[in-house]
Amino acid sequence: MTAVDYTVIVVYLAGMLALGWWGMRRTTSTSDFLVAGRRLGPAMYSGTMAAIVLGGASTIGGVGLGYQYGLSGAWMVLTIGLGLLALSVFFSARIARLKVYTVSQMLDLRYGGSSGLISGIVMWAYTLMLAVTSTIAYATIFDVIFGLDRVVAIVLGGAIVICYSTLGGMWSITLTDMVQFVVKTVGVLLLLLPIAVVKAGGFAAMKSELPSSYFSPMGIGAQTVFTYVLIYSFGMLIGQDIWQRVFTARNDKVARVGGTAAGTYCLAYAVAGAVIGTAAKVLYPDLGAPDDAFATIVKDALPIGVKGLVLAAALSAVMSTSSGALIACATVANNDIWARLRGRPATASHDEVAGNRLFILVMGVTVVGISIALNNVVEALTVAYNVLVGGLLVPILGGLLWKRGTGAGALASVAVGGTTVIGLMLWKGVLANEPIYIGLLASLVAYVAVSLATKPTDAAVLDAWHRRLAGDPAPEPTPAAPANA
């Protein structure tokens, strides 16, 4: 690292804080703070959506999978992109028209208010662990950049994200995500990808140096791909962090078109990461761990200045996911859990922006503390997605697609699916495939059986649901009052 590289990194970090301050000046209401006023156009929407779904796991982990498996290492990020495409094409327009703030509020609208608390707890656990995994990644990046101690690196990276997220909420996060999207595009796609391929001697040399399995589309294994689809593609359909970005769209057309563009971008990013990892395998065949491939090729193969920009791209990947997960975690904690536990609805006199700021600050400090205590990023991320998909996929998609589904069925589905997933992870291990396979099946059986065994959802509830889905004017949902009200 040279002075030029350090300057690039420092300017980038300072810019994130400056954008946080700028975003604060645009935030005057709860809608501004939580969903950027629901007024993002297609360019900003697609850029910020791509930024949040392509985090440290997609960048550093995607290159690592390419190093380990070759081109088929792209499948993890490909399934993320395919999930985003499915969400955008089939569901985003309806989601955007609901005009809610959280997934649990959608479940309340659909089922009549019977499942919000338990679904909120499950979603909170998912967003919390997602934020933790992103925050842990700061240790790796800041170690490469500054040689910082792990704890110091986590505190530094976490403090920057907490600061700009707390200042301006979703407006600050939107502005920083757009910069991060551009930095990632330039750093990874336009610089690191071609430089890595050239350094490795081109594709012909890569093919001659590596086993044929490195160029097989299914070299990673069909079962692994199937598991990725269940966890990541379905996770894209129902995660609060993703839905909260859909809520920022100006209208349903922006949500559909912008999301489709972001999903397509993810597919290109997936292939790029796998190719970079494959090139790294040619250049550095004996690395201690596949996830070291990204840092190694950046340190050893890139020229002055470019190295700093690509490391800024890695920071961008981590920060965009971290900030998105943090605001989602705080939104769920405040609006779906705290408000229900105290049983006190908000009124117009409450300073709701201040209350949501407080929750982001508290959740951010909690995330940093857990990140310092944990080490295994992969296991934490797997727990997050297993609990999310096993507990909430069926009642959410069932609510959107099956009018016979009931609140009792949704509650049973969340409880049975979530419990089954957690129990099997304790028995078979966190990284086993059985928890998500069996958990999803158990959740589906419980949802269908209990829904058919109970009275249909009240006609008035369904009528209000269908009118909201159709985009009929409806008042903004009332979020929780602040904790200090």
Question: Which stretches of residues belong to each language-model region?
Answer:
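Membrane-embedded helix-loop-helix hairpins and adjacent transmembrane boundary segments
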Residues: 1-485
